[in-house]
């Protein structure tokens, strides 16, 4: 099992804290939060001597693939740079947000938004494949429900070459049935963003800080996606508490039968 720590709690200068993460755990970085020089310098530090793997979260700020107002040509340029990062530093996957909130411009149609999101996702996936990059489609946290569970699975599920990262916190927030999601997508789920919440917001709590039955989750994980990477995407550190949460998580994993 690959366990990866997101650098979400350590954006910017504070990324140096990630050097304290034990070397067996990997790192997931947000590509848009640094230029090439920044990542050249920082990855030398945080990945030095590390057996854990690197993954990269693709750009998402001000990007909504479902919106007519999205400048998709600029999005493609941004992802080309990100795919270059993936290959330069041998990252195992790149994460894609396939849509944002429901656009607020007059005349937006939900069905057209789903179609636009799918078409653009497929184009980015083709670009990724041409570069030998594994692009993973993530479920979103927005409670205004541009895509609920049914729409997400109906829109992206039939495209058999697509691969997925399921964000547990986003699924919890929107009351998705995780057993149904995992049993539908199965081993096309290549990774998870692991975090929790109380249904009151996308708070990115650590395993053990929220109400989720993680033993039940790991029963489904073992049945349907046993090789998927676990990316701990927490809002806060410190590193020692993140590592402690891994111990809690693994207790649930071992208890899952």
Explain the meaning of each model-derived region.
Residues 1-87, 254-257:
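N-terminal pre-domain/capping segments
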Residues 2, 14-20, 76, 92, ...:
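Histidine-acidic metal/acid-base catalytic patches
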Residues 2-7, 25-29, 54-58, 94-96, ...:
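Hydrophobic faces of well-ordered beta-strands that scaffold small-molecule active sites
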Residues 7-17, 30-44, 63-73, 102-106, ...:
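Acidic-and-aromatic substrate-binding clefts and catalytic sites of carbohydrate-active enzymes
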Residues 19-21, 45-46, 85-88, 123-127, ...:
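Alpha-helical scaffold elements within enzyme catalytic domains, especially in hydrolases
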Residues 46-61, 116-128, 156, 214-217:
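Alpha-helix-loop-beta-strand connector modules within alpha/beta enzyme cores
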Residues 60-64, 100-104, 196-202:
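Conserved radical SAM core fold
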Residues 71-164:
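Active-site acidic/histidine proton-transfer and metal-coordination neighborhood
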